[in-house]
A protein has these predicted regions:
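Carbohydrate-active catalytic/glycan-binding domains of CAZyme proteins
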Residues: 1-286
């Protein structure tokens, strides 16, 4: 089967996250950079203005920025390494514009200071309770196996109002070959199933998997679909991951990933966009 894969003109960008706002697509990626496009998903232009007011405690690792619109403001969920603790952690920044500047509203890392935490994402449940779902990175767990975690957020998104809970381990699925949890993204289906896209490594490389909550809640029991959403086994040539789903200006859903996960010859990690569809309570690529 020949799948449609849109290759962007961006030469190198990891963890691409796309939103559609006022007829314009915005793509954010590691390094705290932003690109935009209004007429094509292939051709993007770098936004040259300052995107983020860099927090004073930031010592690099400006990873996986996501931008979510909430209560009329734009919130960036992202990662950086702390000068004080030397650990990576998640933070939340706010702006009036999708082009920034985004200013930190949390008191530094919002995630536990004794953890390395990355890839925070945003979800609002059926009771309008905001959550951060994030990675408890394998480098700071007692057995070098990554976890997915979640905590409730305050209404203003400045702090946790619950202790983080563990959702699942990286080594739970039968296909998983590494202890990596990466790139969580929440998706609610039309029949109210709560899915999570996330990445680990199968026998062919970096991939995108689907987990689902058995009771439709963040703190429910999470089970793993056997069929991967994206794998080199299916698509050939390159692996890829850190997926998210967005809807374009015409209402078509797409999966955004970086592919490959590491350079292959002259091919760098670049944003790749693939049409996806919701069918029978899951996400599929045709």
């Amino acid at each position: 089967m020949k799948h449609k894969i849109i290759e962007t003109n961006i030469e190198r960008l990891r963890d691409p996250f796309v939103i559609t706002e006022n007829g314009t697509h915005y793509m954010y990626g590691t390094g705290w950079v932003c690109y935009k496009s209004s007429d094509s998903l292939e051709h993007w232009t770098r936004v040259e203005k300052e995107l983020v007011v860099v927090p004073s405690d930031c010592d690099g690792d400006k990873w996986a920025p996501e931008v979510h619109k909430y209560n009329g403001k734009y919130y960036m969920f992202t990662t950086y390494r702390s000068l004080k603790t030397k650990r990576r952690g998640c933070t939340i920044l706010q702006s009036d514009s999708p082009e920034g500047p985004f200013v930190e509203i949390t008191n530094g890392h919002i995630t536990p200071v004794e953890w390395d935490s990355i890839d925070g994402t945003f979800y609002v449940d059926e009771e309008n309770q905001p959550w951060m779902v994030f990675v408890h990175e394998w480098v700071s767990t007692d057995d070098n196996v990554g976890r997915m975690a979640a905590a409730k957020l305050s209404e203003d998104l400045t702090h946790f109002i619950s202790e983080p809970i563990e959702l699942f381990r990286a080594d739970t699925p039968a296909w998983a070959k590494h202890g990596v949890t990466d790139g969580c993204f929440m998706y609610k289906t039309q029949d109210n199933q709560l899915l999570m896209l996330w990445s680990n490594v199968d026998e062919y490389g970096y991939c995108v998997a689907i987990a689902r909550s058995k009771n439709g809640k963040v703190d429910g029991e999470w089970v793993h679909d056997e069929k991967l959403l994206f794998s080199k086994e299916t698509f050939g040539q390159y692996d890829g991951g850190h997926g998210m789903i967005f809807t374009d200006v015409d209402g078509q859903m797409y999966l955004s990933i970086h592919s490959p996960n590491n350079p292959v010859g002259d091919r760098l990690e670049k944003p790749v966009i693939i049409p996806v569809f919701e069918e029978n309570g899951t996400i599929v690529i045709k």
